[in-house]
A protein has these predicted regions:
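Helix-rich catalytic cores of soluble enzyme domains
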Residues: 112-154
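Alpha/beta catalytic barrel-like cores
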Residues: 1-105, 115, 131, 141
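A cross-domain feature marking catalytic cores of carbohydrate-active enzymes
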Residues: 72-74, 108-110, 146-148
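Conserved, mostly hydrophobic/aromatic
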Residues: 56, 109, 136
Length: 154
């Protein structure tokens, strides 16, 4: 039943012009100097995701802004008890409810390596990150921030 509801929201987002999308092409165009003059806010919605995503879309529309990244870090998934499927469904539903038209950028934020786990078993830690990425991509995320900064000794 839950999967059916998620599927309905996913399909509605596609049909209503608010699909989950990768921000890659926009960033590449920006790097080539083809677009400029704007910033891209990235917001981590930890609670009231449906309401907050809708509020972000309404605010963006009122400013004629077209790009927002909705993020949820792996650590936030744990303490907010939100899995990728729940998060993206709430974001997309909030965007649809706000009348948003345009790509919806949902990102798995700071999929971070644990230095102690990596030192003990690099392959197991790497597989943990791979698994987290697979779950997010299967849920519909199109952007993942893999953070290996913890493995560098400055």
């Amino acid at each position: 039943m839950i999967e059916a509801a998620r599927w309905i929201i996913w399909e509605a987002s596609q049909l209503l012009g608010a699909p989950s999308a990768s921000i890659h092409d926009l960033y590449m165009a920006r790097g080539r100097g083809e677009v400029s003059g704007f910033t891209v806010p990235a917001v981590n919605l930890r609670t009231q995701v449906f309401d907050m995503a809708g509020a972000m879309c309404r605010a963006a529309a009122s400013l004629d802004a077209g790009t927002i990244v909705f993020e949820l870090a792996r650590s936030e998934q744990e303490y907010t008890y939100q899995r990728p499927g729940e998060y993206i469904t709430s974001v997309l539903a909030g965007c649809i409810g706000a009348g948003w038209r345009g790509p919806v950028f949902v990102q798995g934020d700071h999929y971070q390596f644990n230095a102690k786990k990596y030192a003990a078993d690099p392959e197991a830690m790497t597989e943990e990150i791979r698994r987290a990425c697979r779950l997010a991509m299967e849920a519909g995320y199109r952007n993942i921030d893999i953070d290996s900064s913890t493995l560098v000794d400055l």
